[in-house]
């Protein structure tokens, strides 16, 4: 998370903060979806994170995918916006809470360039319907939308 987030958190304390988050559902040539196992809670999630000041949502999605998985990606479609205050509420292991306004994209994998990120314990490719059971609570409905044949964009 950005330095600004931590400054706001320090000033306001443990109350719930509103955060703009960006995620990307990345597919490979076989149609598999790229997920990362998060170091903070061990759940599987799409690449994504908080937007930085001066960054577009698209830039954030591409940056987060590279930082968390080592894959260069390109955006192919806008999946939707997710703002439900209950479904998009998250408590971090340290007890801090956020309500996420999530901008979701779909994309394709271009090239694996590697790298290390302390947010991800591991990464993996999964066919739709074969996702790990321990998906992150915010990601499950987004992944279900991504693999559906329903018209896009979603507004949830």
Where in this protein do the model-derived segments appear?
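A structure-centric signal for secondary-structure junctions around beta-strands
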Residues: 19-21, 30, 120
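Conserved hydrophobic "DFG−1" position in protein kinase catalytic cores
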Residues: 26-27, 35, 107, 125
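Unchanged
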Residues: 51-77, 82-141, 155-156
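Acidic, metal-coordinating catalytic segment for phosphate/diphosphate chemistry
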Residues: 1-23, 95
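Short connector loops at helix/strand junctions that flank enzyme active sites
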Residues: 19, 28, 39-41, 46, ...
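Acidic/histidine-enriched, glycine/proline-rich intrinsically disordered or flexible terminal extensions
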Residues: 5-8, 144-156
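Conserved Nudix-box catalytic region and its N-terminal flanking loop in Nudix hydrolases
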Residues: 28-68
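A residue-level structural signature of the nucleotidyltransferase/glycosyltransferase Rossmann-like core
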Residues: 16-17, 32, 43, 123, ...
